[in-house]
Design a protein with these regions (language model features):
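Extended acidic/charged loop-beta regions that coordinate divalent cations
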Residues: 11-59, 100-103, 107, 134
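Short internal beta-strands
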Residues: 1-5, 140-141, 160-169
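Short glycine-rich anion-binding loops that position phosphate/pyrophosphate groups of nucleotides
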Residues: 7-8, 46, 144-146, 170, ...
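Short beta-strands and strand-loop turn motifs
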Residues: 4, 188, 216-221
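Short, charged/polar "capping" segments at the starts of alpha-helices
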Residues: 7-12, 28-30, 147-148, 171-176
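Nucleotide phosphate-binding/pyrophosphate-handling subdomain across enzymes
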Residues: 57-161
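C-terminal helical cap/extension that packs against the catalytic core
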Residues: 153-214
Length: 246
């Protein structure tokens, strides 16, 4: 079995698993894959794992080396190594892998501000994975929550969300969680006559208030159908709006 050693819920029952291997974003111990500087290394599927590690890839092999992407690469690498796949083949596979559209895609980096399209983050869990990646965020969020609660998402990431620009039908659900658990976060509600206009207004407002070091992150934590055809349209309008900024 292969588990994520950085996940406390998973590791809480690890002692019940036979022949356990794991992966971590940190330097690996015996029986783990992990990261050393910019290398992804294996100390699990080699003869002398007590004293040695082998490189199976580098972070440069990944299209977007944010933490959860690295974690996914480690999981895939561990499965491949367990099947006897050579490290060269794993590195090639990671280099050739094309991430899905609208999933933590860097749209633009300008004036020390990074613009990220994660429109595919249609629920709190996915949005949380994106928020945890960055330190200082102007967060564009909202849409159809479909009964989801935002409390845990906000509590976990309250120190990262500098500004929240809220859109969509269930934006007040997010606003209430922010007011309760992240009272220092600036909250603004963005309106418009159409979904396209709303997103353009959100992007323009983000441009006005962003600071050096900010990440402007579209990670709505909600479905899109209240204002858009689907998450892809939402993400594309965001991308187009960002690229049109002067």
């Amino acid at each position: 079995s292969i588990i994520n050693a950085d996940d406390e819920k998973v590791t809480s029952f690890a002692d019940k698993i036979d022949d356990l291997k794991s992966f971590t974003l940190n330097a690996p111990r015996k029986g783990q894959l992990g990261v050393v500087e910019d290398l992804i290394v294996d100390r699990a599927f080699i003869p002398n794992s007590e004293a040695e590690a082998i490189e199976i890839a580098t972070l440069k092999d990944l299209k977007n080396a944010v933490p959860h992407t690295v974690s996914n690469a480690l999981a895939a690498g561990a499965l491949a190594r367990s099947a006897g796949i050579l490290s060269e083949s794993i590195a090639a596979g990671l280099r050739n892998f094309e991430p899905g559209l609208h999933r933590i895609s860097v749209v633009m980096e300008r004036d020390e501000v990074t613009w990220i399209n994660d429109s595919k983050a249609t629920n709190p869990h996915a949005a949380g994975a994106a928020l945890r990646t960055f330190q200082k965020v102007v967060w564009i969020a909202g849409g159809l929550a479909k009964g989801a609660t935002m409390d845990d998402l906000v509590k976990t990431n309250r120190d990262r969300i500098r500004v929240a620009l809220l859109i969509g039908q269930d934006r007040e659900l997010i606003a209430r969680s922010l007011a309760k658990y992240a009272p220092e976060t600036i909250i603004e509600r963005i309106d418009g006559l159409t979904g396209k206009e709303v997103m353009q207004n959100a992007v323009n407002r983000a441009k006005q208030i962003c600071e050096a070091g900010d990440v402007v992150l579209l990670a709505p934590a909600c479905a899109s159908m209240d204002q858009f055809e689907n998450y892809a349209e939402r993400g594309q309008i965001f991308t187009d709006s960002v690229l049109r900024l002067e």
